[in-house]
């Protein structure tokens, strides 16, 4: 059974929050809806704190750090490979989970953020796959979440 331990931020409507422990700080990436009815796919915000359970998360100076429906929405855990950080992102330009963008985080400090697209994963390996919207990696395990087109014959 899950129990609420703490509310980290108040008066924030956030989607797909992703935590990262990097360079002596905890970083929280989240899609924020600033105005009621606005899309949660368009902008990515970043916050930092000394501890993951802190109630004093500081907004990043560059917020929103991404304003692009093709790469703002988080799509899984940030991972490290060959000494580089990668942030999986959803391409929601056509529909939810149209493709994944693997963003290489080039700069991550309290005052600067930069990333570039390192790869794109489109759901083209099977004609039944409509969308791909999550890529998570933990050790040797990689999980991809897809949506299938399952047509029923009546």
Residue ranges of predicted features:
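Carbohydrate-active catalytic/glycan-binding domains of CAZyme proteins
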Residues: 1-154
């Amino acid at each position: 059974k899950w129990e609420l331990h703490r509310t980290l931020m108040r008066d924030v409507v956030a989607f797909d929050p992703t935590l990262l422990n990097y360079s002596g700080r905890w970083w929280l990436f989240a899609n924020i809806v600033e105005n009621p009815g606005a899309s949660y796919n368009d902008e990515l915000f970043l916050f930092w704190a000394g501890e993951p359970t802190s109630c004093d998360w500081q907004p990043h100076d560059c917020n929103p750090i991404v304003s692009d429906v093709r790469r703002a929405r988080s799509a899984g855990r940030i991972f490290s490979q060959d000494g580089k950080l990668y942030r999986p992102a959803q391409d929601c330009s056509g529909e939810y989970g149209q493709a994944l963008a693997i963003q290489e985080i080039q700069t991550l400090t309290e005052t600067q953020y930069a990333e570039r697209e390192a790869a794109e994963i489109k759901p083209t390996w099977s004609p039944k796959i409509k969308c791909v919207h999550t890529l998570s990696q933990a050790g040797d395990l990689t999980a991809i979440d897809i949506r299938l087109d399952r047509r029923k014959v009546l």
